[in-house]
Amino acid sequence: MATLACRVQFLDDTDPFNSTNFPEPSRPPLFTFREDLALGTQLAGVHRLLRAPHKLDDCTLQLSHNGAYLDLEATLAEQRDELEGFQDDTGRGKKNSIILRTQLSVRVHACIEKLYNSSGRDLRRALFSLKQIFQDDKDLVHEFVIAEGLTCLIKVGAEADQNYQNYILRALGQIMLYVDGMNGVINHSETIQWLYTLVGSKFRLVVKTALKLLLVFVEYSESNAPLLIQAVSAVDTKRGVKPWSNIMEILEEKDGVDTELLVYAMTLVNKTLAGLPDQDTFYDVVDCLEELGIAAVSQRHLNKKGTDLDLLEQFNIYEVALRHEDGDETAEPPPSGHRDRRRASMCSGGTVGEQQGLDRRRSRRHSIQNIKSPLSAPTSPCSPSVPAFKPSQVRDLCEKDEEEEEEEEQPITEPNSEEEREDDAQCQGKDSKASSASGQSSPGKDAAPESSALHTTSSPTSQGRWLSASTAARSPVLGGTSGPEASRPAARLLPPSPGLATRPSTAPKVSPTIDKLPYVPHSPFHLFSYDFEDSPLLTKDKGGDSQTENRYSNFSSNSFQSSRPSPGPSGSPSYASSFSSPQDTRSSPSGLLTSSFRQHQESLAAERERRRQEREERLQRIEREERNKFNREYLDKREEQRQARGERYKYLEQLAAETQEKEPRSQSVSRGRADLSLDLSLPAAPAPPSPSSQSPSADSQEALPVPSSPPTLQCPQVSGKDHEPELEAEAGQGADEASQDIASAHRGAESQEEPVLELEPEERASLSEKERQNEEVNERDNCSASSISSSSSTLEREEKEDKLSEDRATGLWSTSLQDVGVNGQCGDILTSKRFMLDMLYAHNRKSTEDEEKDDGEPGRSAQEVEAVASLATRISTLQANSQAPEESIKRVDIGCLDNRGSVKAFAEKFNSGEVGRGAISPDVESQDKVPDTPPAQLKTESDYIWDQLMANPRELRIQDMDFTDLGEEDDIDVLDVDLGHREAPGPPPPPPPTFLGLPPPPPPPLLDSVPPPPVPGNLLASPVFNTPQGLGWSQVPRGQPAFTKKKKTIRLFWNEVRPFEWPSKNNRRCREFLWSKLEPIKVDTSRLEHLFESKSKELSVTKKTAADGKRQEIIVLDSKRSNAINIGLTVLPPPRTIKIAILNFDEYALNKEGIEKILTMIPTEEEKQKIQEAQLANPEVPLGSAEQFLLTLSSISELSARLHLWAFKMDYETTEKEVAEPLLDLKEGIDQLENNKTLGFILSTLLAIGNFLNGTNAKAFELSYLEKVPEVKDTVHKQSLLHHVCTMVVENFPDSSDLYSEIGAITRSAKVDFDQLQDNLCQMERRCKASWDHLKAIAKHEMKPVLKQRMSEFLKDCAERIIILKIVHRRIINRFHSFLLFMGHPPYAIREVNINKFCRIISEFALEYRTTRERVLQQKQKRANHRERNKTRGKMITDSGKFSGSSPAAPSQPQGLSYAEDAAEHENMKAVLKTSSPALEDATPVLGVRTRSRASRGSTSSWTMGTEESPSVTDDAADEIMDRIVKSATQVPSQRVVPRERKRSRANRKSLRRTLKSGLTPEEARALGLVGTSELQL
């Protein structure tokens, strides 16, 4: 066991601003550290030994010899590098020690807290000490920056006076001297903004210090210059002034003459400009300064005698840099502090002289200077020399050319909005002017063609041609270039064209190559237009006429640019051959200016109007193409489902044909049979999973082969007026059509691939208008496909989808969401209505007369009713038989979850003679073959209709939970299939091979085998629920009783009634329960007084009549029963109110707990009879409260049915949610585990470790072992096996996750009992079926039609949702079994796996893994941070970069006087750094504390800060370093041999001064249209 014995001390730094303390005690004691234990566990012993005043939680340990802080969570052995040199003898007999002191974060927090909360002298003392604190501890600066200390300084400084600001600036300067501090300032833009704000202060010292800090900031790194520009722009924009206004106020000497401030300000400008990498930013800054008048300030100081030499030098640097950037060849080379910005010239094929600024941005001085004197030698050969330009046009043209140059191969787009179109139009005008100027700069022989080209721009030929971006980019500079030369680059960039494009005004067509179009995912879809036939493709055989004709066809080239940002500037060497000679463009006849300008304006107006019309057509085409793309994906998906259904319905058709052959021919078919036949044919139509996937709209089907729906199920989409007659006609068809529906369904499935005819735009418009008018009616009728507008946009479809989803969330579910045809809509409406009526009135029929009475439909004959019953049973049988092939392989012993039993029930009903006149099912023959069939209860007609509803395909959605991905393949339980093969004796099959790659789960077997015959009926029978079952209500505990009085008054009733919050608040059925109509009764005080007085009067009379000692009330019930009822009445409204609430199903009067309470009080027949007899025997004696309440309840007809139905209604939403949400979680959890890569990494690592430890080669292991992994520990470090697995996974798979956050659904599933969930689902079905019986019983008595209709809709909705839940449950359980096979569980043990336990094992293991992984990553990150921290820990900015004391010598330094001066200055700087560094090195690299020196030794201690002179020495050294840095920045650097270039992103830009240097004459200003504009004033 290794140990380390050393001296320990503590430093009392509980007050971070007190920097005068020394380590204590002076004679340090020894403490022995164990190297194998974490230091945090040994810290308490050190704290107790030293009796330190610190809080134990705030302490840390620091090494005295290098000031490094030790990691308390690591051991000394792990920090061996930090202890290097710790035990070495210093040579003076003094040993190093470990210092116990306050943690950095605690000290920084205390500093910031004191700065925020102090004021007056305390704040002044704290700010004054701040610089010394940073000098004492080099680690404090880094922690201060991380803890948002800079924000604290800015906040305090913004509210303080100039003295406090000076203290803050001193501290900030100390921070910036450290590399860590400088990096913090770089990342904190608010600090730079605040420093620039202080430049505008009225106090000289504040301004001077702020300028010095900004100079140090800019000088530190060239990348800091753009940061300063951003800060300046942000501050001045917020103030509403132009950028750099504070600097210009100093240069204009508004507050008096201060040469030092002038030098600092101008140096800051030059250093900022020198660090800019691109030309645009350079000119933006320069132009702002020029607008603020720096040219006048510069000239005043340059021409004034006696100007300070340093200031004069800075102004000269600015002027030289500006002229050099403008391309002035006479300018001197820029000093090394400046560089040439890189230019991506477009003429790379020409000579160097031609490339030097051919298409480049110039300053504002430069441009107007050339316009003023066109005969003077321009800087650039291609600089414009005709006064047809506005100064802003120069920049706009440059911007266009550069954008076209960078984005020449990007897709063509349209502007986003009308504002962009107007901007594009303005840009077009500017481009046109630029083009005319370019044309006039050519020799005289080319002037006439150029002039004539102005008239031809509006011709049909030129209108029909659209130049691509790359061609349009060259057109402004194609002065005298011949046609073939100009078309050669186009031939390289554009694909060959079969011919010229058609005019955009022709009928738009979609190219067949639309699938190959580029798509930019980050751009809005409506920005893309792919008009292949509208895009012109230039050919080589077009001569000069073609170029002249298309000269001005590039007006909209800017609108063609993609909105996607450019990846960067790119040179285009292919442009070289397309430019004319520079010498040819220097002179131009100025007489064509007026006529050319006017003609161009006229042609531009016509061109703009034409282009606006073309944009509208293009936008329409864009929308159509995007919808085509949307519908194409939808159609591909639907086609696969149609093909799958087609196979299924082929088998259905065969069954139908056999049934019709065996069916008695004399059977007459009623209208109801036709309705059900229509409903039977519905499944042949595609069933869209959501309203968004509807039948494709007519105009979105252009040029696309769209499969149509069956003609018998969907009629063509015509105007909305034709829908209703078709509905009636289809509904009224007779027996002939009904007998053909089954065959037509198959024929319709075969005809699905016929293309749908396109509709003309006029028809689409009328259809869209009519459909919008009928939108509400269509949604109310639940017509999903043909009711959607065929020309609606994508946004409209999404809005309709949202609306339909809201309706679905409120419980208005409908099976007609699966239908797409008019016939289907009609059949669905009739079927839904008939379903509710049959569920209300259906029962075991005995005679025709009873049927007519019970149904309440005197108009229906006995033959019609019997036909409907026969056809209903036949449909149920056919649908069950159609699913028998796949059902036969997925039947499991689920009990009540088996929702198909129509075949057996129908056969039993037939054998009992009940279906004497009905159809004979072919399954009756197979019934005879099954011996010993156990007798079963007969199903009622409602059960058949329930089965029919279950057999219809529907959308698997429960509220907002989507189960649509549970397909029919999930109906197959792989366990049943495997059990069939496992009957033979033998060992169980091996598990899946490995988890390394996490392969997908195995496909369900026997998919390609022949479907087996239908299973005998006794195996398909489902439980019969024909009597109400006990609901087993549990007593839900309440809070404090709402009523404290014994008297039952109306006032107590009003206090009880309050809105009952149940899950479905948005349910449409709840809107009728508004208690506002009862408010007049509540506020009618006179009636309240009257009612109260009458009761009091009666009570007094009753007491008087009891004078003879007889009983005052009739008591019939026993005391226990009576007391229970009286106690229950204390929390219920008055009995009369209860009766009204029960009759009206008023949930505002009675909540769920009240209904449950009343259910326990329902009077029995015996109690009712006794109460009535006692009341008849003593009519004058009042009943007791309990007896009166029971008598009131007994007066309510069908009380038990009402209460149970009401309880089911109020409890359904919660129960459904409790069933559906766990199922959804389990489904998502299976997907999460299947697709989780981290789980695969963990299992593979664990498998490899186990194989090694066991000496085996196992392929897999049961996942139940995962719960034991954290318990296994190694024998050396006692760390768990999970820790080692986690470490290996993190090292080998850095992109792995923590697993726990990715399997949230599994964690939620671990808390669910799925056995109880299955029981709840069965109980939901039982209660729903019993509720139909309850509603039927209630409907026999007096019941409001609206209430009956609403309850019927609710129960129908619940039935559909329960059926969906059963299907979802079965499929999810089957999927879970497949998943267990996929995870390696042996098949024979899968049935015994408990879902809850399995999920809990995975979840708990994932939680343990996440905790362990965080600890491993934390340790790893600490080590990485420590290594990174040591790179800059305590490092000064003078040790690196420009400020380093030693810099490599340049290979070829110019010799001379300037070089000698620079060398002398360099040596001086090195001397300053060497003399100042020892003081700082003694203060900063070593522990920043003060120690006592031993006078007897006569030698200086290493703790040099113990002397009284050290603070001033340190401050002077730090200030001297800062001054030297600023001084070196203000002095002129040596010239650079190779100037650096700035990146140019826009062409032909010059500085503002060059553009406006000499001004304009009034005639030139009027010719350019500049009169009254800001350009003339500039």
From Swiss-Prot:
Cellular component per GO, a single term: Z disc
SUPFAM superfamilies given in the database record: ARM repeat, Formin homology 2 domain (FH2 domain)
Distribution of this protein across tissues and organs: Expressed in the heart, including left ventricle, kidney, brain and skeletal muscle, including soleus and tibialis anterior (at protein level).
Record domain FH2: where: 1039-1435
Compositionally biased region (Basic residues): 1420-1434, 1541-1556
Domain characteristics, as noted in the entry: The DAD domain regulates activation via by an autoinhibitory interaction with the GBD/FH3 domain. This autoinhibition is released upon competitive binding of an activated GTPase. The release of DAD allows the FH2 domain to then nucleate and elongate nonbranched actin filaments.
Annotated protein name in UniProt: FH1/FH2 domain-containing protein 3
Name of the gene: Fhod3
